[in-house]
Amino acid sequence: MCPARLRTPRTASLPTHRRSAMTTANPLNTSFTSADAAELYQVPNWSGGWFRVSDKGLMEATPAPGLHASLRAIVDEIVDRGESLPVILRFPQVLAGRVKHLNEAFQAAINEYNYSGHYQGVFPIKVNQRRAVVETVAAAGYDYAHGLEAGSKAELALCLAQKMHPDALLCCNGFKDDGFIKLALWGRTLGKNVVITIEKFTELDRILKQAKALGVKPAVGVRFKLHARGSGQWEESGGDQAKFGLNAYELLRVVERLKEENMLDSLVMLHTHIGSQITDIRRVKVAVREAAQTYAGLIAAGADLKYLNVGGGLGVDYDGSKTTFYASMNYTVKEYAADIVYTVQEVCKAREVPEPVIVSESGRALTAHHAVLILPVVDVTGPTRNLEDQELTVPGEDSHQIVRDMYETLENISMRNYRESYNDAVGDKQTLHNLFDLGYVTLEDRARGEALFNAILRKIAKLIQGEKYVPDELEDLQKVLADKFICNFSLFQSLPDNWAIGALFPIVPLDRLNEQPTRQATLVDITCDSDGKVEKFIDLRDVKATLPLHEPGDRPYYLGAFLMGAYQDVLGSAHNLFGKVSEAHVTVRPGGRFNIDLFVRGQKARRMIESMGYEEPMLRDAIEDQADAAIGRGTLTQEQEHELLEDYGEELLGYTYLEYES
């Protein structure tokens, strides 16, 4: 990670833009409060109590009762230290709190139903392999014997090095070669409770062969393809066509094969999984019932299973709607735990088999809440910004007739004719462009006409705001008129799921939340890619096309993208060679105070370039050779060469994102 920069970077203050009366997206409500902002951005619905809007209009982290810290204050402290943005804020207390919340939910259900077994969670590190995340989960889960799950050799090597409770599970999932299996078996000799999951039938003989060669008795689990499927975007992960797992015939063959080897007692776990982010609790109950019946069937076949692993899928309510929408979930963690415990117990009692240790592989639900991506707004563009007053004055006789027609449309818009006015404006704009292409309209008239068109749309938008019925052709008007807030980040690096699968994340300003937002906006990143934009935002009833934001002023304006701790850290791509962003690990203290315990600087430009096969000395030599040639041609002086090489070297060692001098 990068060393500290020599200069002091700051987020640039935004220019104050001139606006006509028609550019305000919402009528100003002078009684707007922090409570209104909390409702507007749905903070109580998605935050789970880990974040809140304060009475002073600040977004705060609230990792425990009585603890709170302003995110704006944390970011200001980072900037004051001379560090660069963007940055991810990590709250280990929130992460530890999520581990506790999950385990206590299952324990409460076990107590309520007098369940004779117990619960052991497993964290699949593929969700976030960052050291701070894995070590925090392992430490917070130690007293609960909360384990880890690895799906590759690299992940297994990482997991084996962690300090874990002796009873904590280390589940080895995914496809395996001999090296993977050997490493897992060596883990058992280290005292780790390693269980190797059979994902396909042919893996069984590999496991038996390596176990005999090493003289280590394996503990084996078997993944079963449930007929039941999940809900939401990952529904296809389950069912008969699932990527992983054995069918019923293969499951029974595993039992027979282990009997032949006199090793049936090595089969300790049944593993099932119906997909990530399950939105509907009914799907969970159906799947758990099928899994429990399968468990009972294996017991009847002679297996002495200890664990029933119901897999992952515990969701996160990203939009706060508490529905079966793909970005939500219609249940709580408490309900999830209670339904699993109750269903397993009901089946076991009916089939008269022992109640197993219940295992779940929850990752998203543990990690999502702990991380916030800070998005510095560096500029704003939009169809109604930077319009000069004279552009909306009465066109002169030298203006083309089409421009004068558009001005007349603007002047005469009313509730009675706004639809007709809109259609006239659309037609006039098309005519304007056609005439320009033919050379009959000047560039100045085109600029006036486009400004008038945008003013017409803005006026119509104000007229129909709050109307119960809006004509179909005007439904997207707000999106068309929206500002584009340019944010200093890469969507592909830091919000990859938004780009790849349309995932929604709550986005909220860090401060000014006791002021009513007056702009409707979409967000764009700083990559040279048209896909680098956020145009869908959470809403209680639907997906919003725009996000209400404030007019930026002289003070830097920051947005927070919340629930960022699951998958985003590990799925990001190096598009345009934008690297991993910096991260601050923050502990919240009493009295609104906080400590930045660790600051990890984001990736250097040099590191990103070297990842593509280049070497820094080679690059420096190439630039120096070109500079020497330029001196020979007389286009560069020796003094300029020194400055050029210094600047080039400084940028190689610098952050890949935009930096501004204070």
UniProtKB/Swiss-Prot annotation:
Instruction: Give residues annotated as binding substrate.
Output: L308, N309, V310, G311, G312, G313, L314, G315, V316, D317, Y318
Which reactions does this protein catalyse? L-arginine + H(+) = agmatine + CO2
* Keyword vocabulary terms for this entry: Decarboxylase, Lyase, Magnesium, Metal-binding, Polyamine biosynthesis, Pyridoxal phosphate, Spermidine biosynthesis
Kindly list the biological process annotations in GO that this record carries.
arginine catabolic process; spermidine biosynthetic process
Q: Does the keyword Metal-binding apply?
A: yes
- Where N6-(pyridoxal phosphate)lysine occurs, the residues are K126
**A Gene Ontology molecular function term of the record:** arginine decarboxylase activity
Cofactor(s) essential for the protein: Mg(2+); pyridoxal 5'-phosphate
Q: Which Gene3D superfamilies match?
A: 1.20.58.930, Alanine racemase, Lyase, Ornithine Decarboxylase, Chain A, domain 1
Top-level EC class: lyase
What residues form the membrane-spanning segments? none
Q: What is its EC number?
A: 4.1.1.19
The UniProt family comment states:
Belongs to the Orn/Lys/Arg decarboxylase class-II family. SpeA subfamily.
Query: What NCBIfam families does this protein's entry cite?
Result: PRK05354.1, speA
- Protein's job: Catalyzes the biosynthesis of agmatine from arginine.
* Name the record gives this protein: Biosynthetic arginine decarboxylase
User: What species is given as this protein's source?
Assistant: Deinococcus radiodurans (strain ATCC 13939 / DSM 20539 / JCM 16871 / CCUG 27074 / LMG 4051 / NBRC 15346 / NCIMB 9279 / VKM B-1422 / R1)
The organism's lineage is: Bacteria, Thermotogati, Deinococcota, Deinococci, Deinococcales
